[in-house]
Structure formats: C-alpha cells, structure tokens
C-alpha cells in the first residue's frame, strides 16, 4: 500500500477504510525529512473482550509467546467468518483450516454464536447430495464438495 501525504499543516493522519491487513512489520519510507509522532495498529476482529474465556500462563517465556501468537492468530482470522490467513487477498472461510483450529478457538473465547453463523453458511453452501464445500460461504474457488479434510468441518465444528 502506498499513501502520499499532502504536506499541508503540522499534522496529518491516514486511516484506511474498507480493508484490513495482516502483517508483522511496517516500513515507512519518506523522501523528505519528516517527524513521525506515532504509528498505531488497530486490531480488527469479531472476538470481543466479553467473549474471551480461557487463559493460560506458564513459567516458560517461549511457551507463553506461542500461546499469545495462537490467540492473536484467532483474533486475526475470526472476522465475520473464520479465515485461513489475514495477510493475503484470498481471506476465505476454508473449512479444513477452521475444523483444525475450532477446538483451540473455543478454549480462548466463547465462539458459539460466531461458529453458529458460519455453520449456517456451511449448510447454505451444501450440495444437493448434502456434501459440504471446501469454502463457506460459497466462493469463486474451493467449491469441491465432500473433499476429505475440508468437508469434515461440517461434522467436526458443530
């Protein structure tokens, strides 16, 4: 993403709308001398603080970091529907990814309503024979029905 500031006034801000990005690092390049007062990352997720349930802390900093990364993975991927990754344009509700992470997600947060809505997407996307898709809601690809691993989500997630 590239944004050019107008250069008017002492302070300018930029806040993208109708999009989100998954990232670990941010790079800012300026052609002129600038003073950056602050850069703020705003998490966007369907998991609210009120939904959070489980918490675990160990005496090992590496394990605690793994737990934190897992929690942030949930925050990053649970946005209206469970996605497989927030950093690509794809951002689809891949069913295999969801069924693998669902149990962990339910430890960290009360995801009942969130998953109930997504399971309705699964039912709406079922084939006439009852097969579940690879992606829910139905999308431009990932629509092969009854694929082992992906279709299993229709039984494992609920």
Predicted regions: what is each one?
Residues 56, 60-63, 94, 108, ...:
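Solvent-exposed, acidic/flexible segments
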Residues 1-87, 113-118, 128-129, 133-142:
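Extracellular/oxidizing-compartment recognition motifs
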Residues 85, 91-98, 124-158:
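Aromatic-lined, polymer-binding surfaces characteristic
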């Amino acid at each position: 993403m590239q944004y050019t500031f107008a250069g008017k006034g002492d302070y300018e801000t930029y806040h993208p709308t109708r999009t989100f990005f998954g990232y670990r690092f941010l790079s800012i390049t300026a052609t002129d001398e600038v003073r950056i007062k602050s850069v703020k990352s705003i998490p966007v997720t369907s998991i609210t603080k009120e939904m959070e349930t489980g918490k675990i802390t160990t005496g090992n900093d590496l394990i605690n970091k793994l737990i934190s990364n897992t929690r942030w993975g949930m925050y990053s991927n649970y946005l209206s529907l469970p996605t497989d990754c927030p950093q690509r344009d794809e951002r689809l509700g891949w069913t295999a990814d969801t069924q693998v992470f669902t149990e962990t997600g339910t430890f960290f947060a009360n995801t009942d309503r969130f998953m109930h809505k997504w399971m309705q997407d699964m039912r709406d996307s079922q084939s006439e024979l009852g097969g579940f898709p690879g992606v829910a809601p139905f999308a431009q690809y990932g629509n092969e029905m009854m694929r082992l691993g992906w279709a299993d989500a229709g039984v494992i997630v609920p």
